[in-house]
Swiss-Prot record:
Quaternary assembly: Component of the U5 snRNP complex.
Ranges spanned by the short sequence motif Q motif, renumbered to the chain: 56-85
Key word Transcription present: no
Nucleotide-binding found in the keyword field: yes
Organism: Scheffersomyces stipitis (strain ATCC 58785 / CBS 6054 / NBRC 10063 / NRRL Y-11545)
Substrates-to-products reaction catalysed: ATP + H2O = ADP + phosphate + H(+)
Protein name: Pre-mRNA-splicing ATP-dependent RNA helicase PRP28
Localisation: Cytoplasm; Nucleus
One GO biological process term: RNA splicing
Taxonomy, superkingdom: Eukaryota
This enzyme's EC code(s): 3.6.4.13
GO cellular component: cytoplasm; nucleus
Residues the entry annotates as binding ATP: A101, E102, T103, G104, S105, G106, K107, T108
Amino acid sequence: MMALEPVSTTRDNIDFVETTHWSEKSLDQMTARDWRIFREDYGITSKGGDIDNPLRTWNEASIPSKLLSIIVDKLEYLEPTPIQRAAIPLALNQRDVVGIAETGSGKTLAFLIPLLSYILNTDKNYLEYEHQQEQNYNKPLGLILAPTRELAQQITKEAQKFGDRLGLNVVSIIGGHQYEETVHSIRTGVHVVVATPGRLVDSLERNIIGLDKCYYLIMDEADRMIDMGFEKALQSILSYVPSTDRLNSTIDSMIFHIKKRITLMFTATISPPIEKITKNFLIKPGYLYIGGAGEALDHIVQNFEYLGSATGGSEDFDSKRFDKLVRIIQQHSRESRQFSIIIFANYKRVCDLLSLELEKNGFRDNVVIHGSKTQELREKAISSFRSHESRILIATDVAARGIDVPNVSLVVNFQMSRKFDEYVHRIGRTGRAGNRGESYTFIDDSDSDVFIDLKKFLVNGGKKCPDWLIKHASTQSQVLRD
């Protein structure tokens, strides 16, 4: 009998495994070193133990085929973003996730794909028949919470691109819409609800919506919800969501093919209230950090116009500051023919005056969004800015998070934000999807409460720190820590 030849373990094979870049290897050839390099390439770090390897391509994920076809063929999302690469495998494995990533990094798809996969894997009989019955029609299978109407509408619009093709009903529950509209939109069954916290609590108390079958919860921009005073509303909503014990003591675990409730949370920062929610509600979450989230944004050039003693931190209109603003806009419009500018102010009155004064100076293509504008006017303004019919959007912080407008070329802080986190969120409107962005911030001594955080942010992020900030008295009282 002839002896079997041993499997080849030549030097060439070993060299291929050790020296070839991960992009030239099949999935089963990936080594621990390859995965480390892959994570470094995409700026992915994690903690929490047993973190699944990131996604290299859409085809390597366990995504239902009809959903995968929509992602790649219909919507043409050809490559996952870093947050999608990191979060989707973890969530598909029914792991709770805390994602810390910049706004504009592709978070929406990072939580929509696992949620839709979960719904599509639900028992077919329940999905096609029982869910539409009287006892279940108003009980969504997934809930997405967002801090603002604008972000909720944006998420709804993205989710409906999938829902319309999959036969799933996605409904938004936000202020500015009548309760009767919600009742009408869920009459034949609702699969996903996208809501702001306050409005959802009202709808739950009125029994318009029930969360008895909602074992999949997503909180987007959770830190922003806390900053806006929604912590109590969040706690109330969480009390309506069924527990893992409830899941396992009923037939629901067989219907939904899960062993635990699933929660995905996305945030730009981890504050004590966020840690409290994570500890009390999430189950052994995996923490994902993308691209040094929370550090200075490398792709945004940050400029500061220091104005010395307090000149413009109130509702009074500062004409000298405005003259500088006009010069900045004029220069930017000369350098960039396809410019889009967002100007932030802290007061509604200042926003309205900015709009009028800019119009007098020839910039008629501007729109305003703030809390006193009706929902219809806000939506119209955002649509006009997104389509480039209007080149300048003037806003209070109601627009600082979540409004996804591609190719914003410049952000101007006419007034520095009162909270430092809001500064990061504001300038994060520009420089999205890897593009270069630029920001200008007017700042004076009335803003000194944020100077220490600003100095730390710039120093830790490797940015040039202005001399006036280094030498300012308010930044001398605390030693910067790495």
